[in-house]
Amino acid sequence: MQQLNPSEISEIIKGRIEKLDVTSQARNEGTVVSVSDGIVRIHGLADVMYGEMIEFPGGVYGMALNLEQDSVGAVVLGAYTSLAEGMSAKCTGRILEVPVGKELLGRVVDALGNPVDGKGPLNNTETDAVEKVAPGVIWRKSVDQPVQTGYKAVDAMIPVGRGQRELIIGDRQIGKTALAIDAIINQKDSGIFCVYVAIGQKQSTIANVVRKLEENGALANTIIVAASASESAALQFLAPYSGCTMGEYFRDRGEDALIVYDDLSKQAVAYRQISLLLRRPPGREAYPGDVFYLHSRLLERASRVSEEYVEKFTNGAVTGKTGSLTALPIIETQAGDVSAFVPTNVISITDGQIFLESAMFNSGIRPAVNAGVSVSRVGGAAQTKIIKKLSGGIRTALAQYRELAAFAQFASDLDEATRKQLEHGQRVTELMKQKQYAPMSIADMSLSLYAAERGFLTDVEIAKVGSFEQAMIAYFNRDHADLMAKINVKGDFNDEIDAGLKAGIEKFKATQTW
């Protein structure tokens, strides 16, 4: 039998120890106690942070949302069918980050920033945190530049400025998404980058939005973040924050961006689902107590930031430029009930709302914007000069028309002044109608508003107002292209432009019969 020399054994062990490559990882590890409905309870994670990424076997990740005395409640990001009780769970020491940058433009990604459009991987290296603190008051600048939506009813009566939060609210199927998509289409030549976040939508609806943006040449400067109805509640809850981070990339570098959240009602429902599964106490309408904070911390990130902020953020690479992120959140109401919990929350957070009404939509007034209830709290300062000058009487005319129309139903004979006011209101209502996917330029809009404001529609039949407007715009773009170009570039209103518009409309009406 061979004798083992103790000194040889110690030399072999010493050699093995020297060759051993140990990269130490101080990682806190726990055990999965239960898995149900995308919620995982973990025992033994002592040093985990709120919102920290937790790694499970097989490359599955979760996010810690409940830090309890004896366990941690985490939500799984993605499929959870491979997870089982007794598996290990490790802290990563990282918070959730998503890819950002111009490489994402023209792409469709999920809530975690993974491409889902079949166009290959993203060629970017930059990532940023999903949850970020909004810029402080010192770094903000007042809103004084417009975001043209291309809709007469919005740009004339409820103007939106760069850095504003303007809520689009209304019942289902009355054109909320159409309004937002048209606003994105109108930005294709404005230099504003767009982000469209689809939350809880049907995949066919998202595919249709992508196709429409592509057809209208707006997909190239748009990022689409899709968390469809088939995705887990966790991804629907995270999608708006991911989209906001992608939009902030442009804002922080002195660019302008527009983000649409379609819609935040579904995000609130997803968050309610997560909270109830985490056994958090329910409040009004079974929503958790922090549902207001859910939306306020998201919408406060939309802002206009100062030159100093951009310069500080870019370490002096960009100077003298302000950045902005404009938000158009969408909220779906039930039977026009704007006093429900989530609608009132978002109304109080935003800088105004565009209220779409079912009755108007069903009577053929599209976009179905109710000018009486809709308001823009800060957009007036950002409105283009010519639009501001010409749209003053439009809102008043519509409000008075609504009031008079209600009384006129009961009165058989009306005096001349009331009848004229009613007819003017009807013509303005007709003028505010607009087809989908046909946003208007500033010059086209100014021309229509000028015709209404200066009484050029008085002798036009109410049913022919739309045809008159189209023919007039076509005539001006053909015969007065210089004037239209000047309005589009400068947006000013002076005596020269006033005289040019007046002479042009008079000449147009002299050659046509309406």
Curated annotation (Swiss-Prot):
Pfam families according to UniProt: ATP-synt_ab, ATP-synt_ab_C, ATP-synt_ab_N
Residues that, per the record, bind ATP: G170, D171, R172, Q173, I174, G175, K176, T177
GO MF assignments: ADP binding; ATP binding; proton-transporting ATP synthase activity, rotational mechanism
Catalytic activity: ATP + H2O + 4 H(+)(in) = ADP + phosphate + 5 H(+)(out)
Enzyme Commission number(s): 7.1.2.2
Residues passing through the membrane, by range: none
Enzyme class label: translocase
Topology with respect to the bilayer: Peripheral membrane protein
Coarse class of the protein's main subcellular location: membrane
Keywords: ATP synthesis, ATP-binding, Cell inner membrane, Cell membrane, CF(1), Hydrogen ion transport, Ion transport, Membrane, Nucleotide-binding, Translocase, Transport
Annotated positions for site Required for activity: S374
Subcellular location: Cell inner membrane
Protein task: Produces ATP from ADP in the presence of a proton gradient across the membrane. The alpha chain is a regulatory subunit.
Family: Belongs to the ATPase alpha/beta chains family.
Subunit structure, interactors included: F-type ATPases have 2 components, CF(1) - the catalytic core - and CF(0) - the membrane proton channel. CF(1) has five subunits: alpha(3), beta(3), gamma(1), delta(1), epsilon(1). CF(0) has three main subunits: a(1), b(2) and c(9-12). The alpha and beta chains form an alternating ring which encloses part of the gamma chain. CF(1) is attached to CF(0) by a central stalk formed by the gamma and epsilon chains, while a peripheral stalk is formed by the delta and b chains.
Name of protein: ATP synthase subunit alpha
Organism field: Pseudomonas fluorescens (strain ATCC BAA-477 / NRRL B-23932 / Pf-5)
The gene coding this protein: atpA
